[in-house]
Amino acid sequence: MQADDKCTPQPEQRSISTPNRSQQSVPDGWPFRKAKDLFDIQKAIKLDVDSFAEEYNMKRKRRGVALILNHVRFESMPTRNGSVKDATDLQASLSRLGFNVRIYTDPTVKTITTVLQSTSAEDHTDADCLIVVAMSHGESGLLHSTDSLYPVDMLWSPFTGDRCSSLAGKPKLFFIQACRGVQLDKGVKIMHETDSKRNTTYSIPAYADIMVAYSTFDGFYSWRNPDSGSWFIQALCEELDLHGRSRDLLTLMTFVNRRVAIEYQSYVPENEKFHAKKQIPSIVSMLTRLVYFPDKHTSALDDINDGSKEKESKVREKVT
């Protein structure tokens, strides 16, 4: 979003305590319009969910599309061994929840742009939500494709409420497995002591209903095992398989964080710099309701073996 450079600061306004908070709240010295005024210039989008509902409606005909952008090979960077396993495992986990999974291996920036724009242009009216997963080498705010760098926000910008109306008011979930810098987490040792009938129209921010889950905190390395896959994606698959239909998404992601933080540690004894290092995922949520994935009873892959995957957390690790 861009700020209007013609705006000028307004005099300081005193806040008055009142039950109607929306009428008294003001931005920090910038001109604004009340939310109800926006309906004069913006066509309202009809949603089959009450503005006061605590959960997203996840009972539509389709669960939705899940895009997986799996960057494995690069022109001038190491091959991301283990990422194919991540993509395969994640496809199985998401298919079990009813998603239409589409995998793109080693896409160029041009291909990524085309895929995102064409998916945004689809009619998602009968879909519950959208998922986009990107797995690659990365830097802070940037991801590497086969041929170039691209900004991470390119993943969600085509799907904001003002650009993809059929997904407005629905959860749009983004999972990013990539480094976000070169810092290493040494870790800290812990010693344990003992249905509504309201027919109202309302507006929502364009960036509402988005969640971005990063594999690591900004500025830090993200870890991947060449044989068993990346820590973050494997932990995500395990939690989706075990609790994908019972826990709300943010609770589930908290347990993904716990798995990565506690169950994993790098093992590179011949290189002290990279040995015995830790990782913690980072979640940015603009969700406005709880996200659940109830059983659709329609997925063709419901019969996939739901067994848990073994993890080898103390084997040679490589940085994503």
Tell where the protein language model's regions lie, with residue ranges.
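Cysteine endopeptidase catalytic domains of the caspase/legumain-like
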Residues: M1-T320
